[in-house]
Amino acid sequence: MTKPIITFNNVSKTFEDSGTQVLKNINFDLEEGKFYTLLGASGSGKSTILNIMAGLLDASSGDIYLDGERINDLPINKRDIHTVFQNYALFPHMTVFENVAFALKLKKVDKKEIAKRVKETLKMVQLEGFENRSIQKLSGGQRQRVAIARAIINQPRVVLLDEPLSALDLKLRTEMQYELRELQQRLGITFVFVTHDQEEALAMSDWIFVMNEGEIVQSGTPVDIYDEPINHFVANFIGESNIINGTMIEDYLVSFNGKEFESVDGGMRPNEPVEVVIRPEDLQITLPEEGKLQVKVDTQLFRGVHYEIIAYDELGNEWMIHSTRKAIEGEVIGLDFTPEDLHIMRLNETEEEFDARIEEYVEMDEPEDGLINAIEEERNEENL
């Protein structure tokens, strides 16, 4: 990892008036030029992290570093960090130009330089020709672009975005996801984005921190978070999941619904109770006799790109299936899946425990160098 631009070291926050602890020993390093997302439900602590980073709140304990320098006591205006708030915080009595140029005027930048940089920045956010437009006459998407332009015109090291897309309609929100991601990559500025929207986080991020009750419960790439949730909370919070109680018989063999199935997971105790995750899109509908499981269709909804089918097995477990095939309510269908479609979770495992287990298991499972060399020599002799 390169030198981090932002570091949180055992950062906690308790509001003294209520005694409520909203952050518990937060630790992370953020690299320069990446798109990070703090993802969690309301009250999870994600916006508190953003406010501490910006200097709007003080940490109760722990240390915050910017480029290796401790900034706990550094004033907001001395931090090379800019924030885009949920309500955009624009000046309604000013024009687009005046809003974007505001910070430069405070720094007493030359007027010609201000005009040049405002023009360049508005071009970046696709607002060329809007310089003299009143803020009150702009659409929600246009106001957001103005707020982003104002945040990036000084070319800060870090831009913080506190749920800036939440007030937009679905189509515009999707368009702005593409625009924000493309802008961040073009500028090479570190973006820290706060949202409760899982799809938004998966679509835009290089790295996601999943938060719950003031703690980071899992961090990783969007693919890691979606395909390898470490516990019930993450699996249930990120996308749709079928979560079934099971038993890990041995490495690569799991039992649930009274049957044994091959898997690609290992490193657990023999006969350890586990939870099995299968995503709805990984279930294939078959004839009942051809499926690994049989379920009875209860209800279905048409979601546009697929049907969302709810079915129940003979043990009463609910199954969600995403399929392009329309089902018939009351019919019995088969469900098929591959070993790769099963993700096995230990009960209540933390991210630290998960990482340690995987590291230990991989080391135990790797062949020794001497054995690898012997195999290669044997193959070479056979080819002579």
Swiss-Prot record:
InterPro entries: AAA+_ATPase, ABC_SmlMolc_Importer, ABC_transporter-like_ATP-bd, ABC_transporter-like_CS, Mo/tungstate-bd_C_term_dom, P-loop_NTPase, PotA-like, Transp-assoc_OB_typ2. Belongs to the ABC transporter superfamily. Spermidine/putrescine importer (TC 3.A.1.11.1) family. Keywords: ATP-binding, Cell membrane, Membrane, Nucleotide-binding, Translocase, Transport. This is Spermidine/putrescine import ATP-binding protein PotA. Its EC number is 7.6.2.11. It is found in: Cell membrane. ATP binds at G40, A41, S42, G43, S44, G45, K46, S47. The lineage of its organism: Bacteria, Bacillati, Bacillota, Bacilli, Lactobacillales. Part of the ABC transporter complex PotABCD involved in spermidine/putrescine import. Responsible for energy coupling to the transport system. One of its GO terms (cellular component) is ATP-binding cassette (ABC) transporter complex. It is a peripheral membrane protein. The complex is composed of two ATP-binding proteins (PotA), two transmembrane proteins (PotB and PotC) and a solute-binding protein (PotD). PROSITE patterns: ABC_TRANSPORTER_1, ABC_TRANSPORTER_2, POTA. Pfam families: ABC_tran, TOBE_2. It catalyses: ATP + H2O + polyamine-[polyamine-binding protein]Side 1 = ADP + phosphate + polyamineSide 2 + [polyamine-binding protein]Side 1.
